[in-house]
Regions:
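Short, basic, glycine/proline-bearing loop/turn elements
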Residues: 19, 41-50, 100-101, 149-151, ...
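Preference for extracellular/luminal or secreted protein segments
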Residues: 1-39, 254-255, 264-265, 283-394
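A charged helix-plus-loop insertion that forms the helical arch/lid used to bind
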Residues: 90-104, 148-152
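Divalent metal-coordination and catalytic microenvironments
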Residues: 10, 44, 77, 119, ...
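Short, conserved phosphate-binding/catalytic loop or strand-edge motifs used
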Residues: 134-145
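Glycine-rich, aromatic-flanked loop segments that form ligand/cofactor-binding clefts
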Residues: 65-91, 108-136, 158-162, 166-182
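Catalytic domains of carbohydrate-active enzymes, especially glycoside hydrolases
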Residues: 34-47, 114, 118-126
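Second-shell residues forming the walls of enzyme active-site clefts
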Residues: 22, 28, 49-67, 72, ...
Length: 394
């Protein structure tokens, strides 16, 4: 069914379009089939736990696509470096920091282009990259997990590299997604564990971490059509009143950040997705039911629930109840469906899994790594495929 068929889906399936879910494992087994048939998700995200071989991965995504009423968005965090979900089946990709320290704009263009084509050949149509965080020398000392994932120390540096990366990636027909809005480089902890608190003022945020977003939003030729919102807390610009002392909410479930800042002030009217709602920054404060409804009410279009099938089902059931009860209005539902349909219309169908071309792409990354003098733990074999590199945590 074409993307605009989203409006003719049964109500329960329309609600499913708001979910981006993870899959249990490498096989399209009965558990996986049941999960997709129950939720009918608008998106599927892949992690290292789902990856065994190129043929296996493509078959997994093709099977999910075949039973979906509308083609899902198939996404992955394929940044390179620390966050490289495909390193067990493809040459490990260099980190953003390695490219930036080498001053290699041609290299980041190659990384974006190769990543985009590789993903389409494996069955994907979306990449949750690039990371837009600014990591100054002072921020490098923080334990937020972003040290090697950033493209720069200044807004201009981040803008330069991410612009070229996006052109390379999206030029292949694979959608990119800027993350983690509105910028958590100044946060002191990792969102997987706790809520990072960023104490910048509104004006400082606009001048620093938001500056690359603002510039890219205004460049029509670069077609930024998706943003991921972080779980960071921003006490100097977003405190929800009505409780004693105010309540600091994660950005992903904050109307102040998603609607007032991103939608209204910065006028971004395209797809907005949450970071994983099972991360510690959310899970230690909210039930999955509460987080799901709050995120949608805040203005998010798609809700990532990545790890636990039970949490995915509970999140879906809670949003369906909220919609049936009138807590979520028909107008609000239609607005998000429209933005999801736009993204799906832009997403291109998969390319053939041509193993000769796959090897050529692998060789391009191998050459880039050599130019950068970049290695990631383990080794690469003569064919350039990944060796015994460790698998990152999900």
């Amino acid at each position: 069914m074409p993307a605009d068929g989203i409006y003719s889906l049964p109500f329960e399936q329309q609600i499913g379009q708001f979910f981006f879910i993870g899959l249990p494992g490498t096989d399209f087994d009965e558990e996986t089939r049941a999960l997709i048939e129950e939720i009918k998700p608008g998106g599927v995200i892949v992690f290292g736990r789902n990856v065994e071989s190129p043929d296996q991965l493509r078959a997994l995504l093709d099977a999910a696509r075949a039973i979906s009423p509308i083609n899902p968005l198939f996404g992955i965090d394929q940044e390179g470096g620390l966050v490289d979900r495909l390193r067990e089946i493809f040459t490990p990709m260099p980190s953003a920091r390695a490219i930036r320290e080498h001053g290699d704009l041609a290299g980041v263009r190659t990384l974006g282009r190769v990543t985009g084509e590789l993903l389409r050949r494996l069955g994907f149509n979306m990449n949750f990259a690039p990371v837009m965080s600014i990591m100054t020398e002072q921020r490098d000392l923080l334990s937020n997990g972003l040290y090697s994932r950033s493209y720069g120390r200044t807004p201009g540096e981040v803008l330069g590299y991410t612009t070229v990366y996006m052109r390379g990636l999206q030029g292949t027909g694979c959608l990119g997604c800027l993350k983690h809005f509105p910028g958590i480089g100044a946060g002191e902890v990792d969102s997987h564990m706790e809520m990072p608190v960023v104490r910048l003022t509104h004006d400082d945020l606009l001048a620093q971490d938001l500056a690359p977003y603002i510039e890219l939003f205004q460049r029509q030729d670069d077609r930024v059509r998706a943003v991921m919102v972080s779980h960071g807390g921003f006490p100097n610009i977003d405190i929800r009143t009505g409780t004693t002392g105010g309540l600091l909410e994660p950005a992903s479930i904050s109307q102040g950040i998603v609607t007032r800042l991103l939608r209204e002030e910065l006028n971004f009217q395209h797809l907005v997705v949450t970071d994983d709602l099972e991360m510690g920054a959310i899970a230690k404060r909210y039930t999955i039911e509460d987080a799901t409804v709050r995120a949608f009410e805040a203005g998010e279009d798609m809700l990532l629930i990545c790890a636990t099938p039970d949490a995915m089902r509970r999140g879906y059931d809670s949003l369906l109840r909220a919609a049936r009860d009138g807590r979520i209005t028909e107008e609000r539902i239609h607005a998000s469906l429209s933005r999801i349909a736009e993204a799906k219309a832009l997403a291109q169908p998969p390319l053939p899994l041509d193993m000769e071309r796959y090897q050529q792409l692998s060789d391009e990354i191998l050459a880039l790594n050599k130019k950068l003098n970049y290695t990631y733990g383990g080794s690469t074999n003569a064919a350039g495929m990944a060796g015994s590199a460790p698998v990152q945590s999900e």
